[in-house]
Structure formats: structure tokens, C-alpha cells
Regions:
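Hydrophobic/aromatic beta-strand patches that form the interior of the parallel beta-sheet core
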Residues: 2-4, 31, 126, 174, ...
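A structural signal for short, well-ordered beta-strand segments and their strand-loop junctions
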Residues: 4-6, 74-76, 175
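Conserved C-terminal RecA-like helicase domain
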Residues: 51-163, 179-180
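A short acidic, often aromatic-flanked loop/helix-cap motif at beta-alpha or helix-coil junctions
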Residues: 35-43, 56-59, 131-137, 212-214
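The feature captures the C-terminal accessory region of ATP-dependent helicases
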Residues: 252-261
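Conserved RecA-like P-loop NTPase helicase motor core
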Residues: 131-242
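Post-DEXD/H (motif II) to motif III coupling segment of the RecA-like Helicase ATP-binding lobe
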Residues: 1-45
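Short, solvent-exposed loop/turn and secondary-structure capping segments
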Residues: 15-18, 86-87, 166-167, 185-186
Length: 261
């Protein structure tokens, strides 16, 4: 009889490893298959970019600069109770769509919005933040049965479209708000790293509030985060770096730590 231990992540939960080191030693030899090996085996997708963008005030003011509407993009808005959620989730979705362009039509069968950009292009935009169950199910059924690249241009989500969601034409993931969980970040990155014809580069961008700190401190914090994500994609056992980004609008009475910038 053979017993095999498999995990897609060393850091599930980001605080407690899936397996203790002494238990892991019982399963030898260990075989790792990381994201970079996966990319090397792809036919079309050859590179992955990971970066951070910053906003001041409300994130909606930076959406146009951070979002490339010529790329197939998955947008994750901040958690409902997150400090970057400046209004209700439905209003945030409406504001994002308004930054993309003007809604000129909607497919009632699938609840796909047709949005005209300022330069005249028509984009197909899906809203998975919608609470109406029949509407969500209709859209999800549509997403699960997409057969062409032109079926969707932009998808806006909140807590869905992460693990297990397959949109092979997705080129970019724009995630708004600080994500403390490396597991969540790697899950989201996985949404844009599917191999398909016509896609040579995938991009993950985290749009976060600009800290009230010196450029050097911000750079150090971002580099720590990028290193942690890179190590995670290599399937190394790492824990998420803990940085508390203080912005000008944060409560001044909020206690500081040596990881506050």
C-alpha cells in the first residue's frame, strides 16, 4: 500500500503549515511542481508580471490608470468591511463600470452589460457581485460555457472567481485593496495564468492605498511582498509579511507597530 500527501499550498491559512516538518519527512521523496515550471511547459503563455499600484483617497480615482481595457481583466473589489471599500459593493461596481465607459445595452438572458468606452469600443462586462440569485446563476452558467475570447472582456467579482474558476482568456487580474493572505493572492494569480492561443503575458496588479511614509520604506514593504509572492509561486514554505499600511485618512489613534509605514 502507498500513501501520498498532496497539497496545492504550503501556507493554507498563512499561519499554520499544512504539514509539520517532522510529518513531511515521512513522505519522501518530495516532488514540487511550481508555477514557473508550469509556465515553462506552456505553449503560448511565457511570462507573468506581478506589481503594485497606489491610489490616494478613494481607489475609484485610480481605476482608469490601473485598468487596461484592451486586456481581458478580472477585477476583485475590496471586502465589504474592508477600509478600502468607500461605499456599498453595488455602488462600487457601478462606479467602476462608469470609469470603463457608458452602459449602452444589456443581454437579459446572461446579464452581460455592453459598455462603450470613450474611444468607441464595445466591451462585454460581467458582474458577479450581484446578489440576485437567478441573475448570478444565469451569469455563472454563461461564464462556465464560454467558447470564444470575445465572450467576455471584463469580470467584476468580490469573493468569487478565485479558486476553481476557469477563464482561460483572462490576461490581467486587478485586485483592489491589501490582501494579507498569500493563499488568496496565489489563487487570484491562477485565474490569469491559463494557457491559450494569443496570450503570451499575464499580469497581476494589486491596487492599494498609498502609505504616508518615505519612498524607501514603501519600496522595502512592496519588495517584501513581491518576494513572498514569488517564493509562494515556487511552492516554498513562507509566511505572509505583515505590513500595516497607514494612510493619511487612517485614524491617528490607531496603534503603531514596528511594521507600520
Amino acid at each position: 500500500a502507498h500513501i501520498m500527501a498532496m497539497t496545492g499550498s504550503y501556507f493554507r491559512g498563512d499561519a499554520v503549515p499544512v504539514m509539520r516538518p517532522e510529518d513531511e519527512q515521512l513522505f519522501q521523496p518530495a516532488i514540487n511542481y511550481n508555477y514557473y515550471q508550469q509556465l515553462n511547459g506552456y505553449k503560448y503563455l511565457k511570462s507573468l508580471g506581478i506589481g503594485y499600484a497606489f491610489f490616494q483617497g478613494q481607489y475609484i480615482t485610480a481605476i482608469r490608470e490601473a485598468l487596461d481595457t484592451t486586456k481581458k481583466t478580472l477585477i476583485h473589489i475590496p471586502p465589504v468591511q474592508g477600509r478600502d471599500a468607500y461605499t456599498g459593493k453595488h455602488d462600487q461596481v457601478a462606479d467602476i463600470i462608469a470609469q470603463i465607459g457608458e452602459v449602452v445595452d444589456e443581454e437579459p438572458e446572461h446579464f452581460i452589460k455592453i459598455v462603450r468606452t470613450p474611444d468607441g469600443r464595445l466591451l462585454r462586462v460581467g458582474d458577479l457581485v450581484e446578489d440576485n440569485i437567478p441573475m448570478r446563476r444565469s451569469l455563472q452558467a454563461y461564464l462556465n460555457n464560454m467558447k470564444s475570447r470575445d465572450a467576455l472582456d471584463i469580470l467584476i467579482a468580490l469573493g468569487t472567481a478565485k479558486e476553481g474558476f476557469d477563464w482561460e482568456w483572462c490576461e490581467c487580474c486587478l485586485t483592489i485593496g491589501i490582501r494579507a493572505s498569500l493563499t488568496e493572492v496565489v489563487q487570484i494569480i491562477g485565474r490569469c495564468t491559463r494557457d491559450c492561443a494569443g496570450k503570451t503575458h499575464a499580469q497581476f496588479t494589486n491596487l492599494i492605498p498609498c502609505p504616508e511614509a518615505a519612498q524607501e520604506e514603501v519600496g522595502a514593504a512592496v519588495n517584501d511582498m513581491l518576494k513572498a509572492i514569488t517564493a509562494s509561486l515556487l511552492m516554498e514554505q513562507v509566511m505572509a509579511p505583515k505590513w500595516d499600511f497607514r494612510t493619511k485618512r487612517d485614524d491617528e489613534e490607531q496603534p503603531e507597530t514596528d511594521r507600520t509605514i
